[in-house]
């Protein structure tokens, strides 16, 4: 058998080399086209650029979590992350306006890379609980981005305690200094308690600080009104310096509203002399001065012969008669003992003559107190509402002199006619598991538990204590009041707490 010469094998090897060269060239062209397409995609404005170092790490993390169904479904929606980042960024820029200057292209790329690098399993877990306690001008933008995707853009509205740390941590960025930024925000009407830092520790501090302060000023992250209130809310006031209140004319002082920004601290003592002879106890109101001295202000006692509870209030501790010159006002209840009205020493319109009605000496209603009935006997503190006349532009009390039952403070309040009146209510106590009781923070002014202890606030500002009252001994109570109450109003409200209320206990 003859074999082919060696030269016959040469053409076959040449053909193999040419075929492999063609395949290699084809692969090179395909690779070049693919690189061009990827380069074009990277240059598109809506594309989030991923960090090259973080891409393999994200892929490995994704592969390790494919077995978890929650993470897998979470990753399935990550395709729209780039649009969500751009939309949230645009919303935040609209909210902040001119307070944030345009960053250079390199800064935008790094921000986009960081956002895309957080798409992996492990980084996303670390950021899962962020921005829990934030509130401020851009809160709506953050809520919208949270509803659409997991990517967070800004951290706006941190507490004042975290603001300095946030500005220090963000000092190396392309943002303006803290003073320039605060000045710009004040010109634009934006709250100064703002930080653009996104460090994990700062977010945790902001969240914990918000939880600690949740019992002071609650705000809704989805309410535009609460955002405006949070932006315009003043910073917590410093402890007020001790001020000695001078009392020249007792009657004038008892009817004058407390000065704004000053808490008038008083003490009520209960004298039970004569109770063995069927008399009611006498209550004395004294002003607590900073030097330790006590100044008498008012005295009150319940009348014996009266269909309803009727407390007479006088500026003379020895003369508690209605016909005396020291009589300044009274507190009267309804038959159930659940509603009380405070009057001055004017004339009752039902007993007044026509000349008296026109002379302006009709009695003035100074306050009304309504206790919520508790006929089912639920355990817990009393619930009360206090209605007082409003204040005019010069901080004087509006005179309310009703001529019939339809013009009284209680009737206006029940008919939702809130013109020229102020509605207050007691602050809801917090249940303490350790002491198994309801507690309120009286700042050391109340030391004994009692169902009579209360704090009066306004619904729009629960931190401003208009009045507080509580027991410090068996027959000694403290009573502190602020603007817009006067001494007579506060003392009468406290007397209503002493009265027995069978339908409220």
From Swiss-Prot:
Positions with biased composition (Low complexity): 70-87, 206-220
Xref: InterPro entries: Tubby-like_C, Tubby_C, Tubby_C_CS, Tubby_N
Composition skew (Acidic residues), residue ranges: 196-205
Record GO terms (molecular function): G protein-coupled receptor binding; intraciliary transport particle A binding; protein-containing complex binding
Subcellular locations according to the entry: Cytoplasm; Nucleus; Secreted; Cell membrane
Pfam families, A to Z: Tub (PF01167), Tub_N (PF16322)
A GO CC term attached to the entry: cytoplasm
Major location category of this protein: cytoplasm
Subunit structure: Interacts with GNAQ. Interacts with TULP1.
Disease: Defects in Tub are the cause of maturity-onset obesity, insulin resistance and sensory deficits.
Family: Belongs to the TUB family.
Functional note: Functions in signal transduction from heterotrimeric G protein-coupled receptors. Binds to membranes containing phosphatidylinositol 4,5-bisphosphate. Can bind DNA (in vitro). May contribute to the regulation of transcription in the nucleus. Could be involved in the hypothalamic regulation of body weight. Contribute to stimulation of phagocytosis of apoptotic retinal pigment epithelium (RPE) cells and macrophages.
Protein name: Tubby protein
Organism listed in the record: Mus musculus
């Amino acid at each position: 058998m003859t074999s082919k010469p060696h030269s016959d094998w040469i053409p076959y090897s040449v053909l193999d080399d040419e075929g492999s060269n063609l395949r290699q060239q084809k692969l090179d062209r395909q690779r070049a086209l693919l690189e061009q397409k990827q380069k074009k995609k990277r240059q598109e404005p809506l594309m989030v650029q991923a960090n090259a170092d973080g891409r393999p790490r994200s892929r490995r993390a994704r592969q390790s979590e494919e077995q978890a169904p929650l993470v897998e479904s979470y990753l399935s929606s990550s395709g729209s992350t780039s649009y969500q980042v751009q939309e949230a960024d645009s919303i935040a820029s609209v909210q902040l306006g001119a307070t944030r200057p345009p960053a250079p292209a390199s800064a935008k790329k790094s921000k986009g890379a960081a956002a895309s690098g957080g798409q992996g399993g492990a980084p996303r877990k670390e950021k899962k609980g962020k921005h829990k306690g934030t509130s401020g001008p851009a809160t709506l933008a953050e809520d919208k981005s949270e509803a659409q995707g997991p990517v967070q853009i800004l951290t706006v509205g941190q507490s004042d305690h975290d603001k300095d740390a946030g500005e220090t941590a963000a000092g190396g960025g392309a943002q303006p200094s803290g003073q320039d930024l605060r000045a710009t925000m004040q010109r634009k009407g934006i709250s100064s308690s703002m930080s653009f830092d996104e460090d994990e520790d700062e977010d945790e501090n902001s969240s914990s600080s918000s939880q600690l302060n949740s019992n002071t000023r609650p705000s809704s992250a989805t309410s535009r009104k609460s955002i405006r209130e949070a932006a315009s809310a003043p910073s917590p006031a410093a402890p007020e310096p001790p001020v000695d209140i001078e009392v020249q004319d007792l009657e004038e002082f008892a009817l004058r509203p407390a000065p704004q920004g000053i808490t008038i601290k008083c003490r009520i003592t209960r004298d039970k002399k004569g109770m063995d002879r069927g008399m009611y106890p006498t209550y004395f109101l004294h002003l607590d001065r900073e030097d330790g001295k006590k100044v008498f202000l008012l005295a009150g006692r319940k009348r014996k012969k009266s269909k309803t509870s009727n407390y007479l209030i006088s500026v003379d501790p020895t003369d508690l008669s209605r016909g005396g010159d020291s009589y300044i006002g009274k507190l009267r209840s309804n038959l159930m003992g659940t509603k009380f009205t405070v009057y001055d020493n004017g004339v009752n319109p039902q007993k007044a003559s026509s000349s008296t009605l026109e002379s302006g000496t009709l009695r003035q209603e100074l306050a009304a107190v309504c206790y919520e009935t508790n006929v089912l006997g639920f355990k817990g503190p009393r619930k009360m509402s206090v209605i007082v006349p409003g204040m005019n532009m010069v901080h004087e009390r509006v005179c309310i002199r009703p001529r019939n039952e339809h013009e009284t403070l209680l009737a206006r309040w029940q008919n939702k006619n809130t013109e020229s009146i102020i509605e207050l209510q007691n602050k809801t106590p917090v249940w303490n598991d350790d002491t198994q009781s309801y507690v309120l923070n009286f700042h050391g002014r109340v030391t004994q538990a009692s169902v009579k202890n209360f704090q009066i606030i306004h619904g729009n500002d629960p931190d401003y204590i208009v009045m507080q009252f509580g027991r410090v001994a068996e027959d000694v109570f403290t009573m502190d009041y602020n603007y817009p109450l006067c001494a007579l109003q506060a003392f009468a409200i406290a007397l209503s707490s002493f009265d027995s209320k069978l339908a409220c206990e």
